[in-house]
Amino acid sequence: MPFTVAIIGRPNVGKSTLFNRLVGKRLAIVHDLPGVTRDRREGRASLLGMEFQVVDTAGFEDDGGDSIEARMRHQTDMAVAEADVALLLIDSRAGVTPLDRHFADHLRRLPTPVILVANKCEGKAGAPGLYESYGLGMGEPVAVSAEHGEGMYELFEALRDHAIKAGALTPEGDDPEPEEPAEGEDGEPDPTRPLTMAIVGRPNVGKSTLGNQLLGQDRLLTGPEAGLTRDAIAVEWEHRGRRMKLVDTAGLRKKAQIYDAIEKLSVGNTIETIRMSEVVVLVMDAAAILDKQDLTIARLVVEEGRALVLAINKWDVVDDPQTALKRLKDRLETSLPQARGVATVTLSALTGRGIEKLMDAVLDTWTKWNRRIPTAQLNRWLEDMIERHPPPALPGGRRYKIRYMTQAKARPPTFVLFATRPEQLPESYSRYLVNGLREAFDLPGVPVRLYVRGGKNPYAEKDG
């Protein structure tokens, strides 16, 4: 039986969101109403190369009768009994509730190990609930944001010993070495799997017109009225022999501009589409390049770890192209430095000019998003970076020691830096390394993630 992890907790703490994050596709219905997930859902999950079975359970309800809540609780108890480890989720924004306390007490009496996970920890709003959760007596909580993908490395760390005990990881391999590339993850086109490409942007910027140009047919509804495309529409086609899947979505507007319930659902579907895509093309109107809402969408794409390409539509009517491009680059530099160097293509969706350049940019960005760097090459680069600019000294004048770096995964490129006292490495030095990775290994415009943790250099031990 594979290593099995059960996700448990009271209703509406984000269990299905975490399940979807780990499984990598939307198998569980996500809604902000308690009790949406009434049955157990199972899927194969992957976390930094660790493979396991994950179970999304119904929310615990404090009800001992034969109500549906009682049956949901019975299903959850069964899932916990069959799991190697359980993740008890709480909502750090809501704080610890009496139900959280009740079921923490209940789980303590069961033999299955329990890891406390404080969800919705993005930003400052979740901090009080995170600190309060220590009072549950379940050990140190793992702070995550299932919605934004934050804290996944820390979750890996918490699960690692349990995975070793279950035989899912070997003790020698418990530090996350670069995982073997799955088919299609090494930057080479995989003819058996389409590249998923989403077209997103504000309403009425020409997303569906662009989609129709790519497909060569009027497959997507177009018109001057904003909001014509309510649902995300997926269409497969071939480009130069490469299978592609195009997803055209409803436009993302500012929240204050979203009035009806159907459009709210469409915006939610767009956000989900971004998460499930590989390359996201953000379409902008040349008359209003990179306004506040464009930046919000671009940040969302980067936070979700997707590959980003910018497409400036209606370029054929721009009076001063050079000034417009400079304004765009300056705004990116100041407002979205993590997307510095992102591929930017000017085009006309109506006439088709620039479409081939757009597809070149999509394929090139996808290749970089899949890039893997050999550990030896990575550490030669790291030595050079440290020699050029050593990390600042620790309090008392002690030298900060960086041991080595490894790439944990691609899609997006994710690196782990092993060092003494990882919590004391300044954020500015992490940025220095991330910028260096982008420049040295040709990763402009691709999300690059760097985690810092303590640990010995296994390569030094092997040499000895």
From Swiss-Prot:
A Pfam family hit: MMR_HSR1
Acidic residues composition-biased segments: 172-189
Record-annotated KH-like domain positions: 371-456
Chain residues that bind GTP 1: 9-16, 56-60, 119-122
GO terms, biological process: ribosome biogenesis
MF annotations from Gene Ontology: GTP binding
Gene3D superfamilies: 3.30.300.20, P-loop containing nucleotide triphosphate hydrolases (3.40.50.300)
InterPro entries: G_ENGA, GTP-bd, GTPase_Der, KH_dom-like, KH_dom-like_a/b, P-loop_NTPase, Small_GTP-bd
Entry keyword Transferase: no
Chain sites annotated for binding GTP 2: 201-208, 248-252, 313-316
Region spans: Disordered: 168-193
EngA-type G domain sequence ranges: 3-167, 195-370
Keywords: GTP-binding, Nucleotide-binding, Repeat, Ribosome biogenesis
HAMAP family tied to this protein: GTPase_Der
Family to which the UniProt record says this protein belongs: Belongs to the TRAFAC class TrmE-Era-EngA-EngB-Septin-like GTPase superfamily. EngA (Der) GTPase family.
Functional summary from the UniProt entry: GTPase that plays an essential role in the late steps of ribosome biogenesis.
Complex formation: Associates with the 50S ribosomal subunit.
Name of the protein in its database record: GTPase Der
